[in-house]
Amino acid sequence: MKKLFALVATLMLSVSAYAAQFKEGEHYQVLKTPASSSPVVNEFFSFYCPHCNTFEPIIAQLKQQLPEGAKFQKNHVSFMGGNMGQAMSKAYATMIALEVEDKMVPVMFNRIHTLRKPPKDEQELRQIFLDEGIDAAKFDAAYNGFAVDSMVRRFDKQFQDSGLTGVPAVVVNNRYLVQGQSVKSLDEYFDLVNYLLTLK
């Protein structure tokens, strides 16, 4: 029992230390959206965004730093990419639907930012999946399905409701926008996100 009290006391001190360290308006911004009912970190991104591409390794590390019970969600926005913006959001939703996100996200970023060969149309977009061994029939069913369309609408609605204007953006508990430019190290960035997860 003493150990339990010691652990709780340590956690409370940690949160207090973070509260003193991180300030609203400097390290994070409070959005006008209602807080989520459970802890969640939302990243808004676009495959067409060069900063999002650079941010990917940090996001990969952030996922490993989140406490048990905290959910991570990636949301593709459609406002970048011209006439392919919506199609690329559908492509990302298709990755989720087919459970090939871990495989295909690096492929798509590499295609656009390293090879500099972004798909010109939906046929080329489809071929990228097929070239990576994704079954054509499964791709077509998912890409043209209701679940993917619903996901894309949710991505864009969440982005619009948040009042955000650019990507990458990380929002904690649907309410706290991380202002990463104010932190001095990756560890401090992870501490900031984990602190915001304690807020309602």
From Swiss-Prot:
Pfam families membership: DSBA
Subcellular localization: Periplasm
Limits of the Thioredoxin domain: 20-198
The organism's place on the tree of life at top rank: Bacteria
GO cellular component annotations of the record: outer membrane-bounded periplasmic space
Signal peptide start and end residues: 1-19
Disulfide bonds: 49-52
Family matches, as CDD domains: DsbA_DsbA
Keyword field: Disulfide bond, Periplasm, Redox-active center, Signal, Virulence
Job of this protein: Involved in disulfide-bond formation. Required for the functional maturation of secreted virulence factors. Acts by transferring its disulfide bond to other proteins.
Similarity-based family: Belongs to the thioredoxin family. DsbA subfamily.
Biological processes, Gene Ontology terms: cellular response to antibiotic
Molecular function per GO: protein disulfide isomerase activity; protein-disulfide reductase activity
Protein name: Thiol:disulfide interchange protein DsbA
